[in-house]
């Protein structure tokens, strides 16, 4: 495990190309389990989480080839009903293979998931939904076993919270429940869910309503092979836009769907940043100290929780006091103590952080606690005086393709240093 050494003071300028969305690619890869024929996915980011999902698919009987950003998936052997613990523990999204395996084979056994440590993310919504769809569920010794027990004609599943993972898991599983009509109420509305619906429908599924709070799935008997391109990563796009603004630079962020970031754009403009949308490109310029703004995270289409840490790093040098309210992951403030080590003035009470802008941050040794927190510390290091060393940095490679090269091309001075034995 290495560290990132960041020389502060760079002004980011130039162009950056956004990769395909990790959060769209992973559930789409899980949905490929529904199909025996070859599935070709384009614009897939080369990230650690994607490689973990590839290993999972291979472990259960699929042939997977990954060249450049194109992924080919095809069932080669009988589908295994159990996924090795050492794979599932690495990544939360791996849990979403439980339903697809169970609906294909009648049974699945998967370990409780791992991934980012940003608070409790219970899988109860997934399991209660699967029960309503005719599966028996047994949780024992850290494993979940799902067995298909009874056919259903019609069921409505109302999620207590619009969970992205549960929405994706349940709609994917329901897609192959032949003859069943499954309605998900209070569904998550993220663009990645729309992408998943579009992919499954291209394979022959019958799903409508993704992007709204009510999704209706008509189960079919069989899926067919398809070629499909993953949407751009809106969180990666937002991260680079914040970084350019924080450094008081100017840049062009390419391969973006601006409709996916409306709320975020509004907040950036409130801080004084100048944005210009040019088709699937966004130009940003920020030459002055940002104005403080209040940010409240909410499920889509609200301000994304996955951009809250980066926004906090940006606002740490704003003029005035910003109030950041975290409504999605209540404990998503692990980056606060690290930013404070760099001179940020932040106080947390419950799910609210009060950010009093300071003139400058100072380089310091800090530790990445999760994927987006590490991105926030990288931004803080770029705008700080002096050198920042970020340890436990492997998180960032789970969510940002070619992150060092992309930031370096914008003018950041970043080096990855292997840990000495």
UniProtKB/Swiss-Prot annotation:
It is found in: Cytoplasm. GO terms for cellular component: cytoplasm. It comes from the Bacteria. UDP-N-acetyl-alpha-D-glucosamine binds at residues 92, 306, 328. Pathway: Cell wall biogenesis; peptidoglycan biosynthesis. GO terms for molecular function: UDP-N-acetylglucosamine 1-carboxyvinyltransferase activity. It catalyses: phosphoenolpyruvate + UDP-N-acetyl-alpha-D-glucosamine = UDP-N-acetyl-3-O-(1-carboxyvinyl)-alpha-D-glucosamine + phosphate. Phosphoenolpyruvate binds at residues 22-23. This is UDP-N-acetylglucosamine 1-carboxyvinyltransferase. Cell wall formation. Adds enolpyruvyl to UDP-N-acetylglucosamine. Belongs to the EPSP synthase family. MurA subfamily. One of its GO terms (biological process) is UDP-N-acetylgalactosamine biosynthetic process. The active site is at residue 116. The keyword Cell division applies. The keyword RNA-binding does not apply. The modification 2-(S-cysteinyl)pyruvic acid O-phosphothioketal is found at residue 116. Keywords: Cell cycle, Cell division, Cell shape, Cell wall biogenesis/degradation, Cytoplasm, Peptidoglycan synthesis, Pyruvate, Transferase. Its EC number is 2.5.1.7. InterPro entries: Enolpyruvate_Tfrase_dom, Enolpyruvate_Tfrase_sf, MurA_subfamily, RNA3'P_cycl/enolpyr_Trfase_a/b, UDP_GlcNAc_COvinyl_MurA. It comes from Thermotoga maritima (strain ATCC 43589 / DSM 3109 / JCM 10099 / NBRC 100826 / MSB8). It is an enzyme of class 2 (transferase). NCBIfam families: murA (TIGR01072), PRK09369.1 (NF006873).
